């Protein structure tokens, strides 16, 4: 595994630090008036989700880990476990539903997601950035209410509540960004 300097850490990098695997969530490069420059890095443990703030000087060496990414197709859920099938080998694997966190409701039957592995252990899963959902409940459209840039609450077919523009009505399909959990556009 390659070692990188502390000032080369970027958001999204996976590092081996303090005996665990950590994902760099946020990186701030700081150059104080006195003393050497350093990177203030917010890390998230890939195994248990705990967070840690660390300071890395430019001279510090950190082990960067490359994760293997595989496409997995969602099949079904059983006892809090999500069952996926590898798109290439047709091998089935079970992953805990907590791996997706608050994005879990956006997982749909047959959807292909990217799962990141390290030594055959699934550490992270990412949904497609945009997903089509149906609005099942929202306030009716009121004419003339488009003057201000306002939004109204809507409940989607998966139970998630998002804010939508006033022109979106009930039973309409919309596109939702799964990373921010916000309305993107009409489908």
From Swiss-Prot:
Biological process terms in GO annotation: peptide biosynthetic process
PROSITE patterns: EFP
One Gene Ontology term of the molecular function aspect: translation elongation factor activity
Signal peptide: none
Pathway field: Protein biosynthesis; polypeptide chain elongation
Domain of life per record: Bacteria
Alphabetic keyword roster: Cytoplasm, Elongation factor, Protein biosynthesis
Function (record text): Involved in peptide bond synthesis. Stimulates efficient translation and peptide-bond synthesis on native or reconstituted 70S ribosomes in vitro. Probably functions indirectly by altering the affinity of the ribosome for aminoacyl-tRNA, thus increasing their reactivity as acceptors for peptidyl transferase.
Record-stated family: Belongs to the elongation factor P family.
Protein's name in the database: Elongation factor P
Species of the source: Jannaschia sp. (strain CCS1)
High-level lineage: Bacteria, Pseudomonadati, Pseudomonadota, Alphaproteobacteria, Rhodobacterales
Gene field: efp
């Amino acid at each position: 595994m390659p070692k990188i300097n502390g000032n080369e850490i970027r958001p999204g990098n996976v590092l081996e630090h303090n005996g665990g695997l950590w994902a760099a969530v946020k990186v701030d490069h700081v150059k104080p008036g006195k003393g050497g420059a350093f990177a203030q890095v917010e890390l998230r443990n890939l195994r248990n989700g705990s967070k840690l703030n660390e300071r890395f000087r430019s001279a510090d060496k950190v082990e960067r880990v490359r994760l293997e990414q595989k496409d997995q197709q969602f099949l079904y859920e059983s006892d809090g476990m999500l069952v996926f099938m590898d798109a290439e080998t047709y091998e089935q694997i079970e992953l805990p539903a907590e791996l997706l966190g608050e994005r879990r409701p956006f997982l749909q039957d047959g959807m292909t997601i990217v799962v990141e592995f390290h030594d055959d252990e699934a550490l992270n899963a990412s949904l497609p950035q945009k997903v089509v959902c149906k609005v099942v409940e929202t306030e009716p459209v009121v004419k003339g209410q488009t003057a201000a840039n306002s939004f109204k609450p809507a409940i989607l077919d998966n139970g998630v509540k998002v804010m939508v523009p006033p022109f979106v009505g009930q039973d309409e399909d919309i596109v939702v960004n799964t990373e921010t959990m916000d309305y993107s556009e009409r489908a």
